[in-house]
Amino acid sequence: MTTICDLPRDLVARILSRVPLTSMRRVRFTCKRWNTISKDPSFAKTHFGKAARQFIMMSQSRVSLMSVKLHGDGNEDELADPYIYEGYRLDVYALGYDKNLKNHKILRFVDSYEPAVKHSIIEHEIFDLKSNAWRVLDATPDWEIDSYQRGVSLKGNTYFFAKEKIVVEGDDVVVIEDFKDFLICFDFTSERFNLDHVCLYRFTLTMERPVREEQLAVLYQQDTCLMEIWVTNKIEPDVVSWSKVFLAVDMEPLTGSFIPFAFFAGSFFIDEEKKIAVVFDKDQEEINDRAYLIGENGYYKEVDLGYMNGYYQQQVDPRGPDPVFPLVCSYSPSLVTIPQGTRGKRKERDY
C-alpha cells in the first residue's frame, strides 16, 4: 500500500515548501525521508523563497512582527502585523560573531554629553557571551555616529554610517555645509572599526540587509526628492564596492510634495526580483505610520499602518509628544532555541 512517505521526492519537496517554517519541526518527525528533505540546502533555499518576507517593526513601545507579500500590481500587495508585543525602548546595541573563538558578542555604544567640554563623549563596550561579562573597548575614533543612524549586521559584523567628528571649543557656532558620511564596519573578530574611505554626501542614508543575500542596500537622498537605492556587489570588513543603482525615482510627481523622507526615519527593504522598495515613514502630518511602495515606471502605493499607539488621526491629541518614527528590521524565522543564561555583570556608572 502506497503511503504519503512514498510520494516522489520532487512532489514532496513542492508540498513541504508550502508549510510554514514554524511547523517544520513536526514535518521532520513525520518520517526519516521527510527529515532528510527538510534539511537539504536546495530545499531550504526554495522554502525561504516561497515564504512571505517578515520584518520586525518598532514604533515607540509597540513591537510588531510584520509579514509582507509583494505582487507588483499595486492592488494585491499585503502588509500585515498579526503579532503585537509590548516592550521597552532599547539602547544602541550591535550583535556580532567572533569567527576565531566561535563566540557571539555584543557591542554597546555609550554616548553621553558633557557640558564641561560641550560635546559628546563616546565609549564602546563589548559583552562576551562565553565569559558573560562586559568590558570597555579601547577605541578613540575621529568620527561619530548620529543617534538616528542604525547599524546593520552582516556576515557576523555590523556596519554603520559615521561622520567626521567636529569638536567645537567655547561658545562658537560652526556651520558645515558639506558633511560627508563614511561607511564603517565593526569587526567582532578583531574587535576594531574599519573605515571605508569612500565618502557619501549626507542627507538621508539608511541601510538594509536583503534577507536572502549577503549584501547591503543603502537609501540615499540629497535636498531634493530624488531617491536612490544602491546595493553592494562586494562587502568585507575592509573592502566595500557598490553595484549600479538598484532604483532611482523622483518622488515629487508621485507624492505631490517636495519633502523627502525624514533623515532620521526611512527604514526600508527591497525586493530585487520585482524591483520594488518599501520605505517606512510617517504621513505628511507626521501622525500615522505609513509604508511607501515604490518601483519602476511610476509604480507607487501608500499603505496606512495606523497611529503608533493603535489610535488613528482623529483621536490624536495635537498637544501630545513628538512623533516616533517606525523602525523596521529584517527578520528570518528560525527553529533554533536561544539558550537562557544569567545576566552579565557590568560596572555601574552615572550617565
Swiss-Prot record:
Residue ranges annotated for the F-box domain, each copy included: 1-51
PANTHER family assigned to the protein according to its UniProt record, in alphabetical order: BNAA05G37150D PROTEIN-RELATED, F-BOX ASSOCIATED DOMAIN-CONTAINING PROTEIN
Highest classification ranks of the organism: Eukaryota, Viridiplantae, Streptophyta, Embryophyta, Tracheophyta
Protein name: Putative F-box protein At4g09790
InterPro entries, per database record: F-box-assoc_dom_typ1 (IPR006527), F-box-assoc_interact_dom (IPR017451), F-box-like_dom_sf (IPR036047), F-box_dom (IPR001810)
Organism domain of life: Eukaryota
Protein species of origin: Arabidopsis thaliana
CDD domains: F-box_AtFBW1-like
Coiled coil residues, start to end: none
